[in-house]
Amino acid sequence: MKTFQLGFVGMALLAAACGANGADSSSSTGSDEAITDDHVGTALRVTQTNLVSDQPGVAVTTDPNAVNVWGISFNPAGPAWVSNNGTGTTEVITPVGADVLTVTVPVPTYVQADAGVSSTPTGQVFNGSATDFGGDKFIFVTEDGTISGWQPSTGAVLHDDYSSIGAVFKGVGLGPSMIYVADFHNDVIDVFDSTYKQISVAGGFEHPALPKGYAPFNVFVNGTQVFVAYAKQDKEKHDDAKGYGNGYVDLFDTAGNFEARLVSRGVLDSPWGMAIAPASFGKLAGALLVGNTGNGFIHAFTLSEGGYGGTTATYAGYLADTKGKELFIDNLWGLAVSPAPDQNRLYFSAGPESESHGLYGRLDVPGDFDAGQ
């Protein structure tokens, strides 16, 4: 029987965790108004296990490829695939941190093969179809504006190159025989069919006006729900401008029709990682977890459907360390729940020290993980 260490945090603790501005979650209405600290939620204590890092002594495995570790995806019958933005690679990592395969993600076509330049992978997805995307099992997008696919017989192959228009692909989600790609520079969700051809969808991922300078940062698909996280662009429109309240999360259907603004500003700070909390997460089980790249915190929102307003999100709490303090992971990127039989594991990736290093690890409710697995 799994045990849970759950605690309720007071207003003062939540205010301290949110910083001097006292920013908290938005209400379920998705209002752009400043949020006060009147949403007291559950602090779920988790244990952090660092599995892979490029820095000796930081994790179970030291791997020089693990620099600015970013996207995470799972083959339901196998271990995690984890992208390293800083070295242009993707690695297959077991639950105990062993690296069993390294894949080089292709560079854009304009880069010479001998130029000594690596690609910049960000998000990735697993494709379970035997025919869609030419049978590619894993699909990678990059800040170079490229899309590549991998399968055992060919390795990683470049399929789309939008570097010439300055595309900066920060994230990707898999829909019904299509992928949704967040082009942060051009402020658009690009959609590609199962042949890697760019297409239009009915809704076009049009959304109610955001403040100037916000753009799609990542896409997370859960069944028929498509969640899009928005971050504030820097002056070059290449990277995010971090800061408390800098972020939004919207909900769309698979045809790109806007359904709801779930979270506005509040506790968000360049949100990127998104996942549905596993059953082992007690009172937060089933909640939408949103990880902030800006401040390294992970917040939870309970989703409710029905009624005139459609789907709404209510602030539910956050992840805390074993001492009850809000869990901090420097330059947090990915969040992903592993498939059966280990579906109660939440994995994370990060690029600590301004993306100069990397970290991949696991977050467990105490007593939930057998290290011998």
What are these regions (language model features)?
Residues 20-24, 30-373:
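Sequence/structural signature of beta-propeller domains
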Residues 1-8:
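Bacterial N-terminal signal peptides that target proteins for export
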Residues 14-17:
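C-terminal motif of bacterial Sec signal peptides marking the signal peptidase cleavage site
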